[in-house]
Amino acid sequence: METPKNRNWKVLKSEYLSSQPWFTVRREEVELPNGNRIPEYFIFEYPEWINVIAITKEQKFVFVSQYRHGLGITAYELCAGVCEKEDASPLVSAQRELLEETGYGNGNWSELMVIGVNPSTHT
């Protein structure tokens, strides 16, 4: 059996370009395992975040409609938000966000998964 090769990238240089409460941008120069270099690789750092898939008693999904400037449109999306420091857990954050954004609360809650939004560039 072949031994797995090291696939990690080597960070040659790293600098923060912008640091805001909801978003931080870092630029790195990296070297790939094959020796190739990428002089500007951008990484976006976010605080811990939750998304809620809410289903009503009538088996209907709950979405919110919000203007999103990045897209330039009002879009339907899952209820989502940042885990606040005062929240005891991501579950508490999810419950708070759902109530704030939709008025829905209570019900049965379960964690489905923990995933990265876009693991290639987001932390």
Q: Where are these predicted regions, by residue range?
A:
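Residue-level detector of high-confidence beta-strand sites
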Residues: 14, 40, 64-66, 107, ...
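Acidic, metal-coordinating catalytic segment for phosphate/diphosphate chemistry
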Residues: 13-51, 56-57
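Conserved Nudix-box catalytic region and its N-terminal flanking loop in Nudix hydrolases
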Residues: 6, 44-46, 51-96
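Residue-level signal for pocket-adjacent positions within structured domains
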Residues: 12, 38-39, 71-73, 77-78, ...
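Active-site segment of metal-dependent pyrophosphate-handling enzymes
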Residues: 24, 47, 57-58, 68-69, ...
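Glycine-centered flexibility sites
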Residues: 21, 35, 80-81, 103
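Extreme N-terminal tail/first-helix region
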Residues: 1-19
